[in-house]
């Protein structure tokens, strides 16, 4: 449970405000979901509770620029910055999807200084399950 810490605010009428105590985590899991249109990076603790997340769309990219590797790199940097502020030092990386931003997001995480213990590709692959949709004709 998160404790609330009383904090005096001298700027606004001297009111006492309650502020959340940020969770300190040393280990975590970084999930990269790279779809064909967007890349979503979610940072969780070991139990799966979300610490931070970012996507190419939330990083300010709109339209077709969301699918670029640079947009994925920016999204990964934004998500990791918040995780480092929470005290994360080492993480596992789970990559899902066929998108263009897979490698760029992983490169950005490697450059961030977090020690990577495990890198897994968890893209769902059918064992000849459902029939795929018909091919697009453009």
UniProtKB/Swiss-Prot annotation:
For the biological process aspect of GO, one term held by this record is: translation
Keyword vocabulary terms for this entry: Plastid, Ribonucleoprotein, Ribosomal protein, RNA-binding, rRNA-binding
Q: How does it assemble?
A: Part of the 30S ribosomal subunit.
Which molecular function GO terms apply here?
rRNA binding; structural constituent of ribosome
Give the CC-aspect GO terms: plastid; ribonucleoprotein complex; ribosome
Please state where this protein is localized.
Plastid
Note the superkingdom of the native organism: Eukaryota
Could you say which protein family the record assigns here?
Answer: Belongs to the universal ribosomal protein uS11 family.
Pfam families per UniProt: Ribosomal_S11
Protein name, as recorded = Small ribosomal subunit protein uS11c
Q: Which residues form a coiled coil?
A: none
| Organism of derivation | Cuscuta gronovii
């Amino acid at each position: 449970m998160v404790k609330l810490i009383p904090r005096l605010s001298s700027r606004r009428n001297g009111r006492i405000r309650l502020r959340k105590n940020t969770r300190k985590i040393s280990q975590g899991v970084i999930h990269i979901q790279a779809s064909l249109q967007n890349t979503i990076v979610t940072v969780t603790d070991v139990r799966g509770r979300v610490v931070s997340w970012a996507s190419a769309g939330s990083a300010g990219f709109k339209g077709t620029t969301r699918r670029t590797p640079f947009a994925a790199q920016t999204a990964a940097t934004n998500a990791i910055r918040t995780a480092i502020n929470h005290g994360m030092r080492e993480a596992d990386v789970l990559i899902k999807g066929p998108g263009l931003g897979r490698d760029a997001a992983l490169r950005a995480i490697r450059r961030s200084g977090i020690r990577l213990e495990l890198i897994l590709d968890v893209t769902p692959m059918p064992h000849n399950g459902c029939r795929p949709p018909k091919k697009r004709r453009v």
